[in-house]
């Protein structure tokens, strides 16, 4: 997100200024790279919207048909809806900031985009963490009394935890307005027009940044990592046990366990990359036009799409529904020719 021009904060002793000396010749991307980046981002946004729209539609149809939705389906609906909104917002923001910078720079418009961006990102992080936690509780094989009690109550707790995550994300996004203020540092001409573009930086207090990082990103990140690692260890232990008792032929159950280990590992890697990219991007460590900042945007756009595709691929119900959809789409051209 672009920064805004505000008067420098007078309480300089209480502020940590993330100053990045901006040389336009060094930080501004070439027109070719800008076009390529926009094309990649657009492809990622559309892929993510389609994949998450499919997940939402399947579970909505399940809810209408069965008058209820499973706990995992409820989490997936929350996650998919937040990602559809997030990627639609990011696509709209790029369009407006590229075509009407003066309109985008208005206080109301800019803050609306910033609050929505932070809120939807944090919702997505929390929902994905709860999905990982739910799979861990339901699949992992531990015999501790507290764990067994949690497994028995998890389905009733999840709806409350999801709405609590929405409240935390919204409260935190509103709090971020006060710490993510920027001040105007430099300006340079835009070669394609007679106007000038300003370079902005953020002033974020150390305490606020720590709170911002820990509450918004680190807590769901730690929860996701712990749940994923414990699930992988449990599946690995059970896989080794089945392999020691195998008769020599391929065991479908063991192959399913191996597939679950791989899928969880992929989810973990994607989640970590996205969380790190989000923190770097929101912290304004690099200039808005730098290659590193662009890379963070690409990673943040790729995560919802790739994670949703893996969810469809590894979920039997979603995978079956996707194959049926492909089959129907394949038959439509034949029906039109008849």
From Swiss-Prot:
Pfam families attached to this UniProt entry: TAS2R
Location (main, coarse): membrane
Cytoplasmic-facing ranges: 52-74, 138-156, 227-262, 313-338
Tagged with keyword DNA repair: no
Assigned keywords, A-Z: G-protein coupled receptor, Glycoprotein, Membrane, Receptor, Sensory transduction, Taste, Transducer, Transmembrane, Transmembrane helix
An example Gene Ontology CC term for this record: plasma membrane
Positions glycosylated per UniProt: 194
Gene3D superfamilies, A to Z: Rhodopsin 7-helix transmembrane proteins
Keyword Glycoprotein: yes
InterPro entries, A to Z: TAS2R (IPR007960)
Localization in the cell: Membrane
Family of this protein: Belongs to the G-protein coupled receptor T2R family.
Other notes: Most taste cells may be activated by a limited number of bitter compounds; individual taste cells can discriminate among bitter stimuli.
Protein name: Taste receptor type 2 member 39
Origin species: Papio hamadryas (Hamadryas baboon)
